[in-house]
């Protein structure tokens, strides 16, 4: 006996707008990794923005601004905590010099100092961990969206899904990252750790040479906004 089974088969690029017309929720088969539940709404927001301004590159810039504004309270908490620790460096240095032969006593005195000044030593790292899923979901969304293929931005960037042919964007990204690390490393007392932090932009620049232009563009804008936020938060902390 024979049984006739009818089914629809999608053969082609994973353009989500067209996939929805074939079958309900077929667009959900686009692989955005384990953070798909964040990447999906971000892509919908990106699509809405692009339908208005009709340029995927500027849409990436705008969605980056939106995400940085949303996560600003966490960023502020991170840099305020860093500023407080930086302000305590003279006292921390005194403690280390006074008890240089007793590491346990140094730890105890540091805890007492942090409690007295109402500082959480992990306060600068917790906001970073909270923000990480958001920015990872942006990463998965940008590399997983076929809509960005052959999508031009401006000037020499003719395809946001491929690497910058002249490596200009990765170099700009490296410079912005270096500026951020230079400011942040002022809070690090360990010279070896400080050197590693200062060298990180070089490593990331090399990696980003082969990253899609759209993804590098996102990191550049994100870093530039971070630099502005750093300046604003640090200057406000000093004035207060």
Swiss-Prot record:
GO molecular function: membrane insertase activity
Key words, A-Z: Cell membrane, Chaperone, Membrane, Protein transport, Transmembrane, Transmembrane helix, Transport
Protein's membrane topology: Multi-pass membrane protein
Cellular component annotations (GO), alphabetically ordered: plasma membrane
Annotated GO biological process: protein insertion into membrane; protein transport
Complexes and interactors: Interacts with the Sec translocase complex via SecD. Specifically interacts with transmembrane segments of nascent integral membrane proteins during membrane integration.
Function: Required for the insertion and/or proper folding and/or complex formation of integral membrane proteins into the membrane. Involved in integration of membrane proteins that insert both dependently and independently of the Sec translocase complex, as well as at least some lipoproteins. Aids folding of multispanning membrane proteins.
Similarity field: Belongs to the OXA1/ALB3/YidC family. Type 1 subfamily.
Record-linked PANTHER family: CYTOCHROME C OXIDASE ASSEMBLY PROTEIN COX18, MITOCHONDRIAL, OXA1
Name this polypeptide is given: Membrane protein insertase YidC
Origin species: Buchnera aphidicola subsp. Myzus persicae
């Amino acid at each position: 006996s024979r049984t006739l089974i009818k089914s629809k088969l999608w053969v082609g690029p994973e353009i989500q707008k067209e996939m929805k017309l074939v079958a309900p929720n077929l667009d959900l088969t686009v692989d955005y990794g384990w953070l798909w539940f964040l990447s999906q709404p971000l892509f919908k927001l990106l699509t809405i923005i692009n339908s208005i301004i009709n340029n995927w590159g500027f849409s990436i810039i705008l969605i980056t601004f939106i995400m940085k504004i949303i996560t600003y309270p966490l960023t502020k908490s991170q840099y305020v905590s860093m500023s407080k620790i930086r302000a305590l460096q003279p006292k921390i240095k005194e403690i280390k010099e006074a008890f240089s032969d007793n590491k346990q006593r140094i730890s105890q005195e540091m805890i007492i100092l942090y409690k007295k000044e109402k500082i959480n030593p992990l306060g600068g790292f917790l906001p970073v961990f909270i923000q990480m899923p958001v920015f990872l979901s942006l990463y998965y969304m940008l590399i997983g969206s076929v809509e960005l293929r052959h999508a031009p931005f401006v000037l020499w960037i003719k395809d946001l899904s491929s690497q910058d042919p002249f490596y200009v964007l990765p170099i700009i990204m490296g410079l912005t990252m270096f500026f951020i690390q230079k400011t942040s490393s002022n809070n690090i007392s360990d010279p070896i750790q400080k050197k590693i932090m200062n060298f990180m932009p070089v490593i990331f620049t090399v990696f980003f040479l082969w990253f899609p232009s759209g993804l590098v563009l996102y990191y550049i804008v994100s870093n530039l906004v971070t630099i502005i936020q750093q300046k604003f938060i640090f200057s406000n902390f000093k004035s207060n």
